[in-house]
Amino acid sequence: MTGKTLYDKIWDAHLAHEAEDGTSLLYIDRHLVHEVTSPQAFEGLRMAGRSVHAPDKTIAVPDHNVPTTEGRDDPKNMTEDSAIQVAALDKNAKDFGIHYYPVSDVRQGIVHIVGPEQGWTLPGMTVVCGDSHTATHGAFGALAHGIGTSEVEHVLATQTLIQKKSKNMKVEITGKLAPGVTAKDITLTVIGRTGTAGGTGYVIEYCGEAIRDLSMEGRMTVCNMAIEGGARAGIIAPDEKTFEYCMGRPHAPKGAQWEAALAWWKTLYSDDDAHWDEVVTIRGEDIAPVVTWGTSPEDVLPITAEVPAADSFEGGKVGAAQRSLDYMGLTAGTPLDQIEIDTVFIGSCTNGRIEDLRAAASILKGKKVKDGLRAMIVPGSGLVRAQAEEEGLADIFKDAGFEWRLAGCSMCLAMNPDQLSPGERCAATSNRNFEGRQGRGGRTHLMSPAMAAAAAITGRLTDVRELM
């Protein structure tokens, strides 16, 4: 009998029913909810006279719309639409009795940071959320992916989800990473290799020595961007780092339940004879600090490279490349490390954790933000913010000239007051560089927190290794 992948094992453990055409009904262990994709779902429950099937497994937190400045719990400081959505989530959480972390709660933050922090995300689970970056939770050996609003309602009502099984892809990062190379460089390099459609129809398992060497924060960064490579989900087999991270979290099992869970978690790995539909192998030593130059995450190159010419691409990509160059205001042949920036944003569900802030602080300590540059650091949760202040990181940021914000999605997306102006160029640690993603006409370059910190000092895209 052929062995199973980690994805196969979790799928089989949660399969409630499978039709002849492969359409399956999966049980869902955790349902994460935020203010943007949930209002219609809760209203659907009301109209049908239904309750939430498993309120103890449903967790809500406002993150996308909330301002990151003081006084943000006052609706007057939000846009009208944002205030309505946050108020709706507050009411729905109370009406339906689900777990809720309001803006006033220190535990509030980005949903994909709050879930792991509070121990809601555990190995072997199925986790869904009405948000495309739910794959973040795959770092724990969980099957986690985004769902649409109609599916949000379905999970609220039944704690199940209808779907078809994906294929298995293995992405192996062998060997060691060089100094200055991070998890963000891994995940962007993978997307640059496979393209944004390379993972379509697959669940990606990331493995190899370089992946195992990553902290849990680093693994979350890698899995977070699986969707940018087209995959349904990204996943990493749990190990001692995973178990240590989960132990003692507020909603992790305790005592005998912990021991029983741990015994099962240790079986969650891909068998040696498991079948892979696709395999991608990249040597860790070949990965360099990278930045994006265009308007797709696959438009990524080492910081030592030059802006590519549109005619260096093939087929239909020539037109797309030229459109990217025009939108980004770039000229082919320009060294990437000579591109001047206006703004630096460090945060998001990709890079808003304590390790990310430490990395940025290590570059910024004793230095100043370039004159005329706008720079902000937005912790991924209130607890991350408190820890950064306790460790003295916040003082480093403020002394350098960064704005020290409250937790939220912030400038990752233009759904709150933190936005770029037309033509404004940003070095960002977020996950998407689409046209208008950070604000209409805004120009986004994706990179690691350390690279963004380096850019803040020099005022241009910079090889962080020069400042280490």
From Swiss-Prot:
Enzyme class, spelled out: lyase
Pathway(s) the chain acts in: Amino-acid biosynthesis; L-leucine biosynthesis; L-leucine from 3-methyl-2-oxobutanoate: step 2/4
Query: What cofactor requirement does the entry state?
Result: [4Fe-4S] cluster
For this UniProt record, give its keywords in alphabetical order, as a comma-separated list: 4Fe-4S, Amino-acid biosynthesis, Branched-chain amino acid biosynthesis, Iron, Iron-sulfur, Leucine biosynthesis, Lyase, Metal-binding
Q: Which GO terms describe its molecular function?
A: 3-isopropylmalate dehydratase activity; 4 iron, 4 sulfur cluster binding; metal ion binding
**Which superkingdom is the protein from?**
Bacteria
Q: Where is the signal peptide?
A: none
Locate the residues binding [4Fe-4S] cluster.
Answer: C349, C409, C412
Enzymatic reactions: (2R,3S)-3-isopropylmalate = (2S)-2-isopropylmalate
Cite the EC number: 4.2.1.33
| Entries under CDD domains matching the protein | IPMI
UniProt entry tagged with the keyword Nucleotide-binding: no
What does the cofactor field's note say?
A: Binds 1 [4Fe-4S] cluster per subunit.
- What does this protein do, in the record's words? Catalyzes the isomerization between 2-isopropylmalate and 3-isopropylmalate, via the formation of 2-isopropylmaleate.
What family does this belong to? Belongs to the aconitase/IPM isomerase family. LeuC type 1 subfamily.
Name recorded for this polypeptide = 3-isopropylmalate dehydratase large subunit
**Species whose genome carries this gene:** Jannaschia sp. (strain CCS1)
